[in-house]
Amino acid sequence: MATEFADTTTHAFVYVAADDPLAQPLLTDLALEYHSRYGSYFGESASTEISRYPVDAFAAPDGAFVVLVRDGIPIAGGAFKRFDERTAELKRIWTAATHRRQGLGRLVVAELEAESARRGYDRVFLTTGPRQPEAKNLYLVTGYTPLFDTALTPDEVVIHAFAKSLDARELDIPGITAAHYSAIRREHADNPRFVALIPESD
């Protein structure tokens, strides 16, 4: 169900539960896109990734799930969950294929950042994969710091992690990077193929 709105010209942001029907087009489309781009690259199905976190991970007070609608139709969206006490992790950022190249991804990221700040977080963190260059470019142009060597090829980096401060404090890049690798190994402990893709250290 919708809990709050934030109007932006002809669009509206609707905050919902991750299992709300309004969120399902986003999750279904993401699963299809992950499958088409990665197949068995990570040693697990796209549906496994989409269902990795419980619904309440994206619920208040620690998280949120937002859908950008136009005339009641979901056209973009995203979510965040708690990474640590200071950091929100952005997830599930999506724009419908029929509405891309309209700047909607930037709107979603900005809304997630604003809501993260309202929830008390002072920095945000996110990851994307080697076969999503559009996502990488989106985060670079919206002020995110890459936590990887940008001189490497996408397949050498594998998991592209980014962070951004929401206030004037300087980012603790080594600390966030170490926490990122630790979280990946923990969350994918049952998938040795995935863990093998992750560097031992930064």
Predicted regions and their residues:
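C-terminal "cap" of GNAT-fold acetyltransferases
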Residues: 18-19, 122-125, 129-143, 148-183, ...
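Conserved beta-strand in the GNAT
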Residues: 65-67, 73-81, 89, 94
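Conserved acetyl-CoA-binding loop-helix of GNAT-fold acetyltransferases
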Residues: 95, 101-114, 140-141
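Active-site rim helix/loop that mediates acceptor-substrate recognition in acyltransferases
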Residues: 36, 40-70, 199-202
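Conserved G/P- and acidic residue-centered "switch" motifs that form tight phosphate/ATP-binding loops
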Residues: 72, 103, 120
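A short, well-structured alpha-helix characteristic of acyl/acetyltransferase catalytic modules
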Residues: 1-44, 168-202
